[in-house]
Each structure stands twice: as structure tokens, then as C-alpha cells.
Amino acid sequence: MSSLPPLRARGRLATAAAALLLLAACQSGPSAADAGGTTAVDDGTTITMWTRSPTATFSQTLVDAYNASHRNKVELTVFPADSFQQKVGTAAGAKQLPDVLAADVVYAPNYAAKGVYLDLTARVDTLDFKGKLAPAHMEAATHQGKVYGVPHDIDLSAVFYNKVLFERAGLDPENPPATLDGLYEAAKKVDALGDVDGYFYGGACPGCMLFTTWPMIWAAGGTVLDEQGTAATLDSDAAADVYGTMRRMYAEGIVPASAKNESGPTWTQLFAEGRIGIQPMGATALQGMKEGPELQIGIAPIPGPKGGRSSFVGGDVLGISANSTKAAAAWDFISWTLSEQAQVEVLAKNKNITVRSDLADNTYAKQDNRLRVFNLLAGEGQTPISVNFGKTFNDTNGPWTAAVTDALFGSQDVGATLKQHNGTITESLAGS
């Protein structure tokens, strides 16, 4: 969520329930094969790798750089996002997975538990920077104390704001609000300009909403799930405050009416056109937006109602498939993707977020402070961990969709609405 969305994940998560049930049926548990090996071999071996379409460009950039500088060769296959989970499930059952598998970070707990990935604990322990790897991704890829994956790419949520509209509204474009209450006041002033709207969200996109609003709860010191990922904690005062503000902005017209039916495909379009003052979204959106006289983009952390900051850390993890017979060559590639050479000179150079906190203040980030904000948030944000995350939160027919729709657009008290739906969400999380 990403993984998407999270920003990029909405479409691919629609098939989550079926795919994860298939994984449960075809894998009995974590594999111990070659779990203690630490060797990395670059001897001309050809290894296979799978990734999803939203991550294709990112993954291909790394593959091309590795292939150009190593004897080993990586053959990358890209699958459509909406069929990727089922493809993995089928291949896992037939023991025909590729050597290297990239996967949405929200599915890492399931993949680790079901034996899709090889245990990488001993290999990761050889990395002198292992403690600097994106903590949310590492936690998601760890099962019963063993590490099954490492960060591949990061897409995290942050506040995007249009500096042009801030100036027109008499706001300081270099000092964005540091509280949710402040975001509301700023959005209200931008909206008062008349020809634009103050704020926007994807009201019919469950992934978009959790990606951009859960950090507000975290920033307030709240939680959305229990530590086991089997119960929801969305019936809190912090959550009621957050969704109460979202509902208020819609009711007052600060958020345009079109937000109610925005299901994700075009949810960043209005901002990119310079017609929205403030909109939390994913970091990867920055690369695709063209700035000009109507749009100059500022980036800030997502705040809580009274302060604090956080981010939903989505994206992908990378691991060695349990059925691979080329683990040493696969590890050579994976470990190289985490190296300073790859993280800075390949990824940061192309305006991507580094997965290592010790490289966050790299040369390229110093040239664009927005990248520096993203890099710092990568170490501060959270990734909710639950085996049943997809069917509960990203499936448009799941219980979270009903909950957030009622919270944003319903007539009942927001707090009461969240309490009413919290039990249904918990039932889904706790289900097999």
C-alpha cells in the first residue's frame, strides 16, 4: 500500500482474499532450505525475478544497473497489478516461483508465514547497515523472529501543498501547517479564493483513505490495529477527531463534491492541475507532476490534530523464493540493491527514496529538500501488520470501505460510527 493504494495498491488488492487463501492452501509454513547460508556469488548465474506493474520502472532501473556491472544476470518479468497475487499463489503451490520475488509490503507478513520466502536472517545479519533499513518494511517482513525480506522500494504518504495557492491565500508557502487543525484553516483560506478547492481525498478509495488518514491518528499517539494485527482500534477519540475533520471539510465545501465518488484512478489529477490547495498523497506522485505557474509543490509530514507527525510507509519488499536453487546469486543481487552505490547513484539520483536512513541526507536529497523529507519519514512512518490486511482494508467490499464511507459522508456521529464498525473490522482481521 504500494504498496497504493496505499497509493498504488488499490487495483491489485481487489483480488487479495482469493490469492491469500490460495497461498494458505499451498504452503505449510516458512521454509528452512538454505536458511543458514550467507554466501553471495557473482559467477555468471542467470536468476529470475518477478514484480508488479506499478513497480516495473523502479525494479528495471536496478536490474539494468546490476546487469551492466555484474557477471550474474537478472531476468525481470512484470505482471499486471490486478493479477499478481493470484499468480504468486499459483506458482507457490506448484513450487515454480522465481528466484527473487518483489511483493507489496502489506502482504509480506502472509508471505513470510506461508513459506513463500526463504529465511534471510543469517544473510541480513552480515549487513553492517541492517539497523538502518526502513524499519516498517523490516518489521513487516519478519515472522517469529526470522527475517524473510528486505526493503525494495518505498512509497510513503506526506502532505502535498500548492505554494502558488498558498501565496494567493496569504499563507506562508515555506511554513506549512504542523497540525491537522492548521491544515483545515489553511485549506479553508485557499478554498475562499473561489476558483479552486482547499483540500481533496479519494472518498471512494479505501486504500487512499487509510494511506493518508491513518498517519494522522498515529501522529496523535493513537493506533489503528492491536500489536497482533487481529483487532481494530479505530473506535478511539483520535480517530473520531481525524474523520470528523475530514467530514467537516466535505460538508463545508472545502473538499469538492467529486471526492465522494473518487475511487482512486484520478485522485491526484486535480492537485496536479493546480486546482487543489492541500492533499496528502504518496511520494511517488511527485515524479509524475509537472510544475509551472499554477503549481509549485511543497512537501510536509502528515500531522495529527494537535501536532506530531507520521507517514504510512508502503511500497515493496524483496526476498528469495523458498523454491530457488540459486540463493547465493539471488542474494548477491538483493544485497547489492541495498548498497550505497545502488541506493544513491542509481535510485536517489533518479529521485527515488532510499531505504537506508544513513543515506537519507545524500547528495541528491540535499539538492531537493522534498526528497530529504521523504527520506526522513521513511524511518519514522508505520506499516500496519496483519495477515488479513488486504481483504479487510483494501477490498472495496471489505468492512473498512463501509466504515470510512459512513465516517466521511454519513449523518450519524463520527465517533459512534467508528465504534459501530470497529467490531466488524476486527472480525475480518481475526478470520482465517
Question: Which sequence ranges carry the predicted segments?
Answer:
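A structural signal for short loop-to-beta-strand junctions that line the ligand-binding cleft
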Residues: 91, 98-99, 127-165, 308-309, ...
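Conserved N-terminal structural module of periplasmic/extracytoplasmic solute-binding proteins
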Residues: 2-110, 125-129, 173, 304-306, ...
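Conserved C-terminal helix/tail region of periplasmic/extracytoplasmic solute-binding proteins
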Residues: 167-168, 173, 251, 380-432
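Glycine-centered hinge/linker elements that transmit conformational signals in sensory
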Residues: 186-189, 229-259
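Extracytoplasmic/periplasmic solute-binding protein
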Residues: 148-152, 157, 181-232, 276
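Hinge/lid segment of periplasmic solute-binding proteins
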Residues: 106-156, 209-212, 298-300, 364-368
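Extracytoplasmic/periplasmic substrate-binding proteins
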Residues: 52, 212, 243-326
